Amino acid sequence: MATNGVYIVMGEANCVVALLNKARRQYQLSQVPTLEDTDPLLRNFTDLKEVLNEVADLADMNPQTYLSPFLDVIKAQNTNGPITEAALAAVAKFLNYGLIDASSIKAANAVESIAYAVVHTKFIGGKSTGSDECVLFKILQVLRSLLLSPPGILLSNEAVCDMMQSCFRIVFEQNLSLLLRKAAESTLADMTQLIFTRLPTFVEDTRHPYIRQLVNPTEKRQKRKKKRQLSVHIETKAKEPENVPTEMTKLIGEAAETAETDGAANLGYDVVLTTDPPVDTVTHPDPPIEEIIKLAEPISAGDEADSESEGGGGEEHHERPPVRAHAGLQREIVSDEEEIDTEQTVGGEEKMPYGLPCCRELLRFLITMTNPVDRHNTESMVILGLNLLIVALEAIADFLPNYDILMPLIKNELCRNLLQLLDTNRLPVLAATNRCCFLLFESMRMHMKFQLESYLKKLQSIVLTEEKQHENGGGGTEQKEMALESLVQLWRIPGLVTEMYLNFDCDLYCGNIFEDLTKLLVENSFPTVGGHTASLLSLDALLVVIETIEQNCEDRENGRGEVAKEQEHKDLKKLGLPVLSGYDLAKKMAISTGGKASPMPVSSSIVLRSNRHAPSTELPSMSQIIEQKKRKRLIAEGTELFNQSPKKGIAFLREKGILGHDEQSLVQWLRTNPQLDKKAIADYICNRKHAEVLNAFVKSFPFENTRLDVALRMFLETFRLPGESAEIALVMQHFSEEWFRANNEPFFHVDAAFTLSYAIIMLNVDQHNPQAKRSQPPMTVDCFRRNLSGTNDSRDFDPEMLADMYQAIKTEEIVMPAEQKGTVKEDYMWKVLLRRGETAEGSFYHAPTGWNDHDLFAVCWGPAVAALSYVFDKSEHEQILQKALTGYRKCAKIAAYYGMKEVFDNLCIHLCKFTTLTSMRDGGAGGGADEDVDLSAAALLSHSSSPEAVALAFGENHKAQLATRTLFYLVHENGNILREGWRNLFEALLQLFRARLLPAELTEVEDYVDEKGWVNIQRVHQKELPHTRNDSGLLSWFGLGGGASEADRRKPTQEQLSSMKLASQVISECRPSQIVADSKYLTSTSLAELLSSIAANSAQIVEQAEPQQKTASLSGEDEDALVFYLELIVAITLENKDRLPLVWPHVRRHLEWLLSPRFGRCPVLVERAVVGLLRVANRNLFRDNTVSDDVLHSLSMLLRLSPKALFIFSRQIAFGLYELIRANAANVHKKEHWAVLFALLEAAGAAVLPDDYVMMTTTEKQQQSLRVGGDQQQQRMAYSDVEGASGRGGGAHEERAYTSEGEERRRGGYDSNSDLESRVDSAGSLLGAQKQPADWIHLDHKDAAKATEEALTALGANVVSSKKNFRQFGSLVLRNGLGRHEPAAFLKVCECLAFLLRDAVHVTPDNFESSLQCLRTMVEASLDGGVYAAGPLSGDAQNRLRSNVTDEKAVKKHHHHHHGHKKKELCTDVTEDADESRNEEQQLIGNYQQMSLHLLDLCSQLHSQTPAIFAKWAQGASPAASDLATVAFIWTDIWRPLLQAIGRLSCDCRRGVRAAALTHLQRAFLPANMATLGAAEWQSCFGEVLFPLLTKLLEPFSQMDPIGMEDTRVRTLQIVAKTLLNHLSALSALDSFPDLWMLLLDYMEQYLRVDSCGNLNEAVPESLKNMLLVMDSTGIFAATPRLYDVTVERLNKFMPELIKDTIPNPPRPGQQQSEASEPKKEHASGLEPPPPSSNSTAATSTSDPSIATAQSSISTASSVVGPLVTCPEDAGISAPIPIQHPLTEVIVHSGPTSPIGSPPQTEPPASSPPQHQHSEHQQYEQYRQQQAAAAQQYQQYNQNYPQQQQQQQQQYAYSPEHAAYYQQQYAHQQQQYAEHYANQYQHYQQQQQQQQQHPVNPTSPSVHGQYSVANPLPLPAHPAYHPIVAPSVNSAFTHVYTPPQNNAPALAPSAPTTTSADSPYFTPIPYNPSQQEKP
């Protein structure tokens, strides 16, 4: 209250008095007494002033005191408008300033008097309507201020109703201005808002007469019999002053008249609407007041049902009374003339403040205003009623269900009116209706389940109806759009969609609301002409569901709950703010009265918009929901079947378990299923066979306390009464009996009930059947009574009862409403709806947010994705496209959350279509919206499938870019659940690969050969791009047209370049390589599906290509596609090495498929498959599991490749195996795996062919040998390492694996599509080097291959002819079936062997045999400097494969000259530069020689370390080692193969290799190295090692180096002789020793007869002499019978004089015992051999046929040596291999005599220093003399044979480069000679001094033999180095030291030589030209 309230009242009073005086002066004509004495209004103000002058505060006064003068003015009839307005303004000011204290006991009377006075305002109207409307506006202001002020809560219900009524009158008066009417509407809104906001503070007090009338059944029955009450007639007329021209009261009077006449129903004074309660409706006890005012949390249905009304006493149930109320706002009845005395009470009681009665009357009146059936309700009235209902619902809708007197109005009348209003075409009404429905169902859907269902069906029907009208050319689509907008708003209610699915779709007898609406939205989401907005709304509705589910999934992932924080409002009393609205005031009032304000959720961006309603306590489980859904589908099917045939329908349902076999379950189903046909029900239950069902059906009705006609009406509504009288009688009999029993037998007999029931049916027909009315008039009530007289067991029925029945039947016909139309049917259906709502079927469950999202998404994802796809396809608006893609992303996230794989696949497949990348294969950017993409701007790229065209089309298609970004985003985020979509994704990746848009991570793959370590798998397949315009006009024909050049026309424009750059940028941002990297995070199923998809895509490419190319190879594009897919599989496999068991089966199947013969014409693909297999194996062998074993075993797939393929891919295999073994040698543990690895090494490095090819080759050689004679063997054109190799590269280019097409076209070779067979040279096959040695021999013949083949054919003939005689001999051929190998692969395999065998670190019992076999094979392949090699190395191609793309400049430069050129990709090509070729050839010579020496070192090292290796294995307790550590095994499987390999290299054409091999062989045969061998092993050694070596050396293996050949033979003979003598005692004990000895004599004879330079002529006799002397001295001849005779007989044939010099006399028998011990003593005193070289490398070998030069003699000896060894039938003798330089050898003299020679030059052992026979100077002089003699002999040789030299030079065609090279080497040799001689001279001086200090007895017993040193030169530092002597500069001194050359790295020198019995010395034998035959 204002402190200056007295002055405020005084001021307002003065203002009103002034206006009254003014009015008095205007109308008073004569002077009268003072106005105060005559005017009561002025007198009241005078009294008020006196009172105010006496008080200090208004609080001390009664408010009625200072209000009454103003109120009198307001009610006065003779005051004008301004006076009344001033009085109203004063009252408003008093209220606004709070002058009336609400806590005062007099405040209630004060506000009541104000309300009455304002409602009954009277004034004299003015001339202008504006001034009158000002008074009316002030009335509205006072009414609003009064109700909204704090004292307003004291107003009575009647006062509030009158106030609202006054405002309604102003609103409905059309004569008033629009502004005033809108102000009245605003006032009504504020007042309505206040009243309903205060609803939580109201209580249902049954003591109130209004409440008692509604809830008391006794009053209900009494009121029915009373006269209907009339509403209060508010006084609108008064006596008019005669002098007032315009009556002030006419406005309100006219408004009242209008209300009474034109619109009585609007305010309803005389209209009474009675709403009967639904049948069988039982109300629950009212909730207590304490529960009502608890506003913090809503009252649940359970609480409401369990609570009891305060005024309900002990009653538990009350029948709901009829709501009998006036259409207008009711109040207490008073007379029109009586005025309310505010100081007195009505009826002796004080009026109660307004509450629920006022609230209900207002609600009822608003509902009445919205009734569309009432014609008096205009559109404006309906809109006003809807708006005020919206205000009420917005204010406090959540609390309306707490009041039982309000909910019936809402459930019945309000919902019925709203549903009827939805049929209107008036858009404002429709909009307001939808808004009201939204608020209603958002808050109270739990209590209106079926009303909500009806509303949703109504919206659906609106959309469908508008569609039909639009299709028929009807009006617009505004109603449809409003309906869709309403659906969107409903869908946005948190939890509503979930509840809809739960309560309707999962309800047995409700429609599938959610599914049907989803289909409807999908159908409307497709854009149509004029329906763009509707489609967007439909799409929004679909997306709302998707977004809600997605948000729920995200919140569950992040752990955010559903509890929304709530807080109460702060105490509004503390806020000194003015009242802005009734809502604020109501909140203040609620707090002031102790109530709590309604909860308001805190606005927070973090808290999820959860369901406002608490979840229901009895929520079904998910399993129950699933089962319910299944039952619903079965019931729907059974219902349809029942309507056709009831018997079949019931049988079906019973079969499915839906119905039991009892009648109760069947009857329950018949009663509760609203979809059943009423006639079908009657046909079933009226059948006499189903009497039990009929009986149970009748008993299911609640007939208790129900009048017979009402019960009969209820009964007949459930089925259609049959037409047969018998059936009717049957049904009526059962009905009457049940009703009679249920109502406690109200009649005297049951037949009375039957009769009365039948009479009611007849009465219904009589009253309503048109035919009956025409025949006779309808009966009256008296007739009806007479007809039933005496039927109640001879008594009459109650007349009043019969009258009521008659009246009910006459008024309302008993009909079958379901068969009716219009209002009858609608009323019945609505009544059924209300009845179902009151049963358990009407229970509505509130579900938590996201409770059943999975099922919802399963229902809507398909339609939603289809709609999104269509919208994205057809729309071009960026906003719509983004919305569609957002929907895709959210659907994908939901699918990933729930693991719905088919959903995610569908999304990805749709997006792949929109990327326009999946159909590029067909040559177009087709698919969806991009079919009309115009590429005409791309001048030459239009209609082209070139990479540039694809990139351009993609860069210009913004929609495709958006889809691509989304696609890759989804795959990166949720690839785990992708299944079928992988195929489409990889198809899109393939198109990007073809368009060259993929990043380097996917196109640059690992490679073993390329020096960079990677290659680019993208190749250029250029095609001529079509021109955009064909200049074929006349000017073009004359050359005047087409000014632009061809290059200008093909050049893309700047815009096109920008588009292609944009395309590349988009793909880069998509990060496609992340798919491979993230594959390790995929689930097992997804990963397996990914690999299967790639394999399926690969197979599809082949299937599509095969119909057109069944015989040809795949196109370049298809091959590249398969390569791309293969590299993806390999990369994914490497990323998932931890899950190799899962991945490997898929990878293996794919690799087996690619390595099959189907792809024999696709070398690029097969090569990458080989590399991929090796990469997988290399990365996964460290794992110790079965999969690693399987991976190793799978390498055997490479062995199944054809020999040609193995040759082509030998580099990759060799380099890959090298990396594999280096990294995983310790991880291979099984023998079979090592066998596979070494077999691959042999195949790659030595071209070891499969067995079938070997057999074929052998057969061909046998056939050739029969046709060609053996005399052509000398035509073999081999060369030694002193020759040049410049001519060997002739066929090099034809033998590379791949080349670019440009190179092929220039050379006229094969194209890129040629098969593997065409990748080898056309001169011959790869089956063996025997057929193609011409590539390594420079001939004068024009056809080198033909000449070489003839030479080899001649050699093969000799081999075959001699094979039959040497079947029992071993062979030095280490491996048969070798093909031509790749040099780079050979060298890499040698490195691999060196790694494995060096120091025997990786040698195990599992790989020992395989490694030896591989070592022997590489030795065979390394023979003669690479005679098996396919061609010289190609420069840097030795270490890398030229598979990378060449630079653009080179391409352009070459393209200028060769239009057919293409980039070099994945090709093995060599340069044609001559200088580079010569350098490569020289490098090849050095590399092959180096590898041969490495292989020798490996053989020697393994030979010497074998005992140590076995000892190490024995220490490791290896069972395999213990089984193998036997002498027989070591010899057979280790030593013998190694000695054969060393012996094989002893036949090499290169002098250095031969010398080193003989040195290693000599060391191997030292007694200490193989001391454990027995006689049988030594016999085998001769038969399988030494004798085959002697046989091989009989062939002219190095004709250009005759001296070298002779020296090799000499050293070999000496090794054989020495070996025989060292083990003579053991061998002599054998029975076969005579045969062995005779065979050795045969070899001596053959070597003596061979062409010789003189050395052999001296060496053979000396060796024979030594052996004879030793054998004679040891008594061998004496011990062996006839051995001496045979020896003498044999020697007499070729050296008879030797017998005389050595053993002229036969041995004596007694001599054997005395002399047999000397050789043993010699053996015992043998010295240890020098340590072997520490260097070890690896190499390979091949096989050659044997030459039978001395066939006759060897044949004779073969029978003697036959028992020594056995050899396979197909084992041949190797072909002749030329050697270069002769080597000297020590001659061992065991007898008493020795040849004359020089003393040793090296330091003797300390135990027995050598004795010098000559002085140092004499030694040096003798050496010089020998040198001069040798030089003289060489000059003589040149003089005697100039013609021979000329022929040799012409034959071998030495180039000038070779001649210069040889001269340079000779000069270097001479320099080395001089340096060596000077050092030797100093050495001799030191030896002389030592001899003088320590003299030695020359006859010392420690010296068992004499040594003759013919050559003063010592051993070279390493046997690998030798001089290369030109033919024109031959020298007799053939073996000198040569330092390492540039092409061969220096090796560690061997250990210094020492003089011993086994030390080698050189014997320089002068060259004797006379002994050399001419060639």
Curated annotation (Swiss-Prot):
Composition skew (Polar residues), residue ranges: 1264-1277, 1895-1909
Protein keywords: ER-Golgi transport, Golgi apparatus, Transport
A Pfam family that the UniProt record links to this protein: Sec7-like_HUS
Bias (Pro residues) ranges: 1797-1808
Phenotype of the disrupted gene, per the record: RNAi-mediated knockdown at the L1 larval stage causes cuticle rupture, mostly through the vulva, and results in lethality in 50 to 80% of animals upon reaching adulthood. Most surviving animals that reach adulthood are sterile due to embryonic lethality, and in over 90% of surviving animals there is an accumulation of vacuole-like structures in the body cavity. The few larvae that hatch have severe cuticle formation abnormalities. RNAi-mediated knockdown at the L2 or L3 larval stage, results in reduced lethality in response to oxidative stress induced by paraquat compared to wild-type.
GO molecular function, a single term: guanyl-nucleotide exchange factor activity
Subcellular location: Golgi apparatus, cis-Golgi network; Endoplasmic reticulum-Golgi intermediate compartment
GO biological process, one term: regulation of ARF protein signal transduction
Main location: Golgi
Biased amino acid composition, Low complexity: 1734-1751, 1820-1854, 1877-1894, 1938-1957
UniProt biased composition (Basic residues): 221-230, 1451-1464
Domain SEC7: 624-812
Transport among keywords: yes
Function text: Guanine-nucleotide exchange factor (GEF) for members of the Arf family of small GTPases involved in trafficking in the early secretory pathway; its GEF activity initiates the coating of nascent vesicles via the localized generation of activated ARFs through replacement of GDP with GTP. Also, plays a role in receptor-mediated endocytosis in oocytes and endosomal trafficking. Involved in vesicle retrograde transport from the ERGIC and cis-Golgi compartments to the endoplasmic reticulum (ER). Plays a role in maintaining mitochondrial morphology, network organization and function.
PANTHER family in alphabetical order: GOLGI-SPECIFIC BREFELDIN A-RESISTANCE GUANINE NUCLEOTIDE EXCHANGE FACTOR 1, GUANYL-NUCLEOTIDE EXCHANGE FACTOR
Name of the protein in its database record: Golgi-specific brefeldin A-resistance guanine nucleotide exchange factor 1 homolog
Gene: gbf-1
